[in-house]
Regions:
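A motif-centric feature for acidic-aromatic and gly/ser/thr-rich catalytic loops and repeats
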Residues: 22
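Acidic/histidine-rich catalytic neighborhood
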Residues: 76-136
Length: 188
């Protein structure tokens, strides 16, 4: 999947994109590109989500050989986000863009839309990915990764914080948008 994700990173995000990306769907042919509908296909944190499972396996087993084998996947996914995230213009947060909160939509100026900057799901997945990658390098004693890990730790501090909406729930987007379907089965 990683070689396919490296190609997708370059093809869809340009030559500055490093590492690899996995959007929210894949198949046995290592499909990593965006899906055909923006309400779910624009979400580019599938690789971060998969890496969370790699980390959880290590956290459960403590298998250092396994961690050394999967570290390149963690690092590559982190490199992708470090090289492609942008500054949200209103508050200066480091965000994924374009993206979406999968399959959910909100109203903006009376129109149902799905594309946004920095949905909460992405922010949490990237936060965990950066923290887990830095912890993996430290656990493995990879002192040559110190500068890279410092950049991950710095980036974590620039991600948007979780915010509570006017109605008392975790906001799904950076803005407290009105959801088109308040009973939607997916939440951030």
């Amino acid at each position: 999947m990683i070689p396919s994700g490296q190609k997708t990173a370059k093809d869809f995000y340009g030559n500055q994109a490093r590492g690899w990306v996995q959007h929210m769907m894949t198949n046995v042919w290592n499909y990593t590109a965006p899906g055909e509908h923006p309400s779910w296909g624009a979400t580019n944190t599938g690789g971060a989500w998969l890496c969370d499972h790699l980390w959880e396996h290590f956290a459960y087993t403590g298998d250092m050989e396994y961690l050394a084998r999967v570290y390149p996947a963690l690092k590559g996914a982190s490199q992708f986000f470090l090289s492609t995230m942008i500054r949200e213009p209103k508050r200066g947060y480091l965000v994924t863009a374009p993206s979406s909160s999968p399959e959910n939509t909100f109203y903006e100026n009376g129109v149902a839309v799905s594309i946004c900057m920095g949905p909460t799901m992405d922010t949490q997945l990237v936060r965990e990915l950066f923290q887990q990658t830095a912890e993996a390098a430290a656990t493995l004693g990879y002192s040559d990764q110190e500068a890279f890990c410092d950049s991950l730790k710095s980036a974590v501090k620039e991600l948007a914080p979780h915010k509570i909406s006017e109605e008392g729930y975790l906001m799904e987007w950076l803005e407290d948008y009105e959801e088109t379907d308040i009973h939607h089965r997916h939440i951030s």
